[in-house]
């Protein structure tokens, strides 16, 4: 799949492609990441891509025309390569929250054009003309859209075949089934004399059905205590079994 990123700071993406698990996605060609600098499409000697907002106020606004020319270059390059015409995504506080379900949907598509805003934002006319979807990482403000773009590409890349050593790993991630992940343990079995410092006995039992049950119950308990909204969503989507519901009802002080 292919991501085209419109960014004033393409240098932020270079280290990301060379390290970690997702490096395999770029080396194998599972992910093709193309970076487009809007300044290259400015029509002035200073390569200026921003100006003061009409109506006054602080900060600067990214101009429509350099972004439109950059997007046109993306479309020309896609056509020349025989690539699909992908949707335009903008990272914005006004966007819908980026969820694992949306990531999974994107992972099965041809890719996207990612627009990284800066300054006070992007001229609304570019958004109205070209943006297909707005996404947000949460209710907080970043300096630009580059970090959300990196987060999205990372989340999608790790779902591509061959990127993770164990292809079942992502199936046990938090949110993959609508719930938070269960706790994990490794060596040594005991860190101290206290019972709380040991690995839960069920995980050492070798009884696969009991281990699966323990993990499911820990998922349910952790999600119910930390993110009850996810329990409500899973229930509404029919993701909870009768056994899940019985266990949730047995948890003290939650009122689920």
Curated annotation (Swiss-Prot):
Coiled coil: none annotated. Its EC number is 2.1.1.228. It comes from the Bacteria. The keyword Protease does not apply. CDD domains: TrmD-like. Gene3D superfamilies: 3.40.1280.10, tRNA(m1g37)methyltransferase, domain 2 (1.10.1270.20). Homodimer. It catalyses: guanosine(37) in tRNA + S-adenosyl-L-methionine = N(1)-methylguanosine(37) in tRNA + S-adenosyl-L-homocysteine + H(+). Belongs to the RNA methyltransferase TrmD family. This is tRNA (guanine-N(1)-)-methyltransferase. The lineage of its organism: Bacteria, Pseudomonadati, Pseudomonadota, Betaproteobacteria, Burkholderiales. S-adenosyl-L-methionine binds at residues 117, 137-142. The gene is trmD.
């Amino acid at each position: 799949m292919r991501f085209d990123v419109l960014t004033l700071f393409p240098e932020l993406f270079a280290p990301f492609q060379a390290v970690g698990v997702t490096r395999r996605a770029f080396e194998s060609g599972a992910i093709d990441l193309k970076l487009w600098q809007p300044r290259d499409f400015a029509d002035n000697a200073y390569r200026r891509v921003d100006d003061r907002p009409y109506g006054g106020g602080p900060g600067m606004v990214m101009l429509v025309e350099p972004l439109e020319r950059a997007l046109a270059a993306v479309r020309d390059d896609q056509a020349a390569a025989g690539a699909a015409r992908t949707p335009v995504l903008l990272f914005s506080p006004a966007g819908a929250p980026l969820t694992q379900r949306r990531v999974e949907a994107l992972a099965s598509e041809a890719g996207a054009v990612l627009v990284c805003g800066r300054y006070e934002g992007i001229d609304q006319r570019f958004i109205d003309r070209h943006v297909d979807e707005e996404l947000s990482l949460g209710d907080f403000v970043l300096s630009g859209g580059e970090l959300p773009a990196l987060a999205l590409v990372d989340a999608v890349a790790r779902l591509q075949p061959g990127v993770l050593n164990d292809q079942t790993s992502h199936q046990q991630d938090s949110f993959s089934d609508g719930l938070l992940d269960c706790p994990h343990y490794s060596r040594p079995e005991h860190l101290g004399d206290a019972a709380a410092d040991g690995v839960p006995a069920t995980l050492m039992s070798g009884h696969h059905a009991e281990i699966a049950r323990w993990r499911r119950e820990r998922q349910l308990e952790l999600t119910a205590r930390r993110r009850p909204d996810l329990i409500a969503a899973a229930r509404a989507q029919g993701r909870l079994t009768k056994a899940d519901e019985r266990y949730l009802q047995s948890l003290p002080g939650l009122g689920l």
